Amino acid sequence: MSERVERNWSTGGWLLALCLAWLWTHLTLAALQPPTATVLVQQGTCEVIAAHRCCNRNRIEERSQTVKCSCFSGQVAGTTRAKPSCVDASIVLQRWWCQMEPCLPGEECKVLPDLSGWSCSSGHKVKTTKVTR
């Protein structure tokens, strides 16, 4: 009986040592990894950090982008002249999209009927933007 207890205790000790060695290895490897670069954005500005582009079966080009903004108090991320920017928060809260001047000069801005975004049109070309959260 005492031999069996010693054998089990010995196995438990080895398991504990193995787990501690595994943990130490992972912590050491994590410490050797270079730090992840953080993008600092100047207060009151926005920066595109990822952009995606594709076409659906109707030959309509779809684009999306991820933006990092550092806005002043009372401002939120928005769009001005087709570029990411900080805009007054009331524009976004009340969905008065065209007040942030999202279109390029010469384009006409119209809010979508369901207030989910806006469209910019010039001649026969129409660009529609839908806001997602």
Curated annotation (Swiss-Prot):
List the molecular function annotations (GO) for this entry: receptor ligand activity
InterPro entries linked to this entry: Chemokine-like_TAFA, TAFA_chemokine-like
What does the record list as GO biological process?
A: negative regulation of microglial cell activation; positive regulation of microglial cell activation
Q: Which cysteines are joined by disulfide bonds?
A: none
Instruction: List GO terms (cellular component aspect).
Output: extracellular space
Q: How is expression of this protein distributed across tissues?
A: Brain-specific.
Q: Where in the cell is it found?
A: Secreted
Q: Which Pfam families match?
A: TAFA
The record's keywords, sorted A to Z, are: Secreted, Signal
Q: What does this protein do?
A: Plays a role in the regulation of microglia polarization.
Q: Which family does it belong to?
A: Belongs to the TAFA family.
Q: Know the name of this protein?
A: Chemokine-like protein TAFA-3
Q: What is the lineage of its organism?
A: Eukaryota, Metazoa, Chordata, Craniata, Vertebrata
Designated gene of the protein: TAFA3
